[in-house]
């Protein structure tokens, strides 16, 4: 892998650096039109969908939870990559010529790595948050401020990882065209290039997916393998069901990312195994297809949220209410019904003590996509992915639930 969008120096570096021909990869106009339509779908769907996701969360107070702040970061990274890189990737891959100057060459090689890093580690943060909420429900949860700090740290690390590729990017004039390339420091075995590519692949793909896989495996075993006590109230059944729905949704999001990006990483590791592969005439079409699949990962999450989460579905219906084929939705499902909005477990606990009951931390930040507004909002607050917050459960009920869930 020469980088994360576009390919180092040219679509096919082994050819572009060793030939005097202007461009050996020219395809018929009808193919270009088809590919242009396919890439346009990505840009429009991703930008519009992710902007709506950010609006749904940030414009509605009850949607501002720890999990959803990370989803905002994920949506921002994906919308930005779709807007700033997809079209440029497509035109460069089709024409094999760089039209955008030195600055954008550096940005184009720099930003996608940072965006993908921010995306996958936002998913990792959500997995960690779900893990702590379900496996260690008594532990303190992240506050809104701490969540924002984590997001800033993610972006700082993302920019640091992407910096070398942006720094060494440059443009070069070849016979009849200009190409955008990465000039790594000279070394007989290209050791700097290889080490960097391997590190990037591990850090933005394999490592976070392993961490996420472990977290959701443990969470899944806890949620699905445990029996809910028969004498438990409907509230507990609803809370466990809510947790399961959120975990299912995030597993779909992560699996979609993994499937979309796996062929891309394999494609760019193959030159180290079979350098002659890039000499094949069909490789341009293969690259366009693999790149389309990778970039399409930016447009699926809004669709997943809309399909699997009632709150997001209400938000999308409201955002597109002007469309004749969109039925009117109960928009109040996104609004704050209760004036008692608790951001942390500590505040829930303190209020519960004043009410002479003991607050349960189960579900303190859990999302319940299927929950609707309750008749008694003073004792129940619903959050984003449907988080249901029970502010007054007895010690007996809580202990019974914990012992069963953690057994």
Curated annotation (Swiss-Prot):
GO terms for biological process: positive regulation of cytosolic calcium ion concentration; positive regulation of flagellated sperm motility; regulation of uterine smooth muscle contraction; response to pain. Glycans are attached at residues 14, 18. It is a multi-pass membrane protein. Disulfide bonds join 105-180. Its main location: membrane. The chain crosses the membrane at residues 32-54, 65-86, 107-128, 149-169, 195-219, 249-270, 284-308. Residues 1-31, 87-106, 170-194, 271-283 are extracellular. Residues 363-407 are annotated as: Disordered. This is a receptor for the tachykinin neuropeptide substance P. It is probably associated with G proteins that activate a phosphatidylinositol-calcium second messenger system. The rank order of affinity of this receptor to tachykinins is: substance P > substance K > neuromedin-K. Interacts with ARRB1. Belongs to the G-protein coupled receptor 1 family. This is Substance-P receptor.
């Amino acid at each position: 892998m020469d980088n994360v969008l576009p390919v180092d120096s040219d679509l096919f570096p082994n050819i572009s650096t060793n030939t005097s021909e202007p461009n050996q990869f020219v395809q018929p106009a009808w193919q270009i039109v088809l590919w242009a339509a396919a890439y346009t779908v990505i840009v429009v769907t991703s930008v519009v969908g992710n902007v709506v996701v950010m609006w749904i969360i940030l414009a509605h107070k009850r949607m501002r939870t720890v999990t959803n702040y990370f989803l905002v970061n994920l949506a921002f990274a994906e919308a930005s990559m779709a807007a700033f890189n997809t079209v440029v990737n497509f035109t460069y891959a089709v024409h094999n010529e760089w039209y955008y100057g030195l600055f954008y060459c550096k940005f184009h090689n720099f930003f996608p790595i940072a965006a993908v890093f921010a995306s996958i580690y936002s998913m990792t943060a959500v997995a960690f948050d779900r893990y702590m909420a379900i496996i260690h429900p008594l532990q303190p949860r992240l506050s809104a401020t701490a969540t924002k700090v984590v997001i800033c740290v993610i972006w700082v690390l993302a920019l640091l990882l992407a910096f070398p590729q942006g720094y060494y990017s440059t443009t070069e004039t070849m016979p009849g065209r200009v190409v955008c390339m990465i000039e790594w420091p000279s070394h007989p075995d290209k050791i700097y290039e290889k080490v960097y590519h391997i590190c990037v692949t591990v850090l933005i793909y394999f490592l976070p997916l392993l961490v996420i896989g472990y977290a959701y495996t443990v969470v899944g075993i806890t949620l699905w393998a445990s029996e809910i006590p028969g004498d438990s109230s409907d509230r507990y059944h609803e809370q466990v069901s809510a947790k399961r729905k959120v975990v299912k949704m995030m597993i779909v999001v992560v699996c979609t990312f993994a499937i979309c990006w796996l062929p891309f990483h394999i494609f760019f590791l193959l030159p180290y195994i079979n350098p002659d592969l890039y000499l094949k005439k069909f490789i341009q079409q293969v690259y366009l297809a693999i790149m389309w699949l990778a970039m399409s990962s930016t447009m699926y999450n809004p669709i997943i949220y809309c399909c699997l989460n009632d709150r997001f579905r209400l938000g999308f219906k409201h955002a597109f209410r002007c469309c004749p084929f969109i039925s009117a939705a109960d928009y109040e499902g996104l609004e704050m019904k209760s004036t008692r909005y608790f951001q942390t477990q500590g505040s829930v606990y303190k209020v519960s003590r004043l009410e002479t009951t003991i607050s349960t931390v189960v579900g303190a930040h859990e999302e319940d996509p299927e929950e609707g507004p309750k008749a008694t909002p003073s004792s129940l607050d619903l959050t984003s992915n449907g988080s249901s917050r029970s502010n007054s459960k007895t010690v007996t009920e809580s202990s019974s639930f914990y012992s069963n869930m953690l057994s």
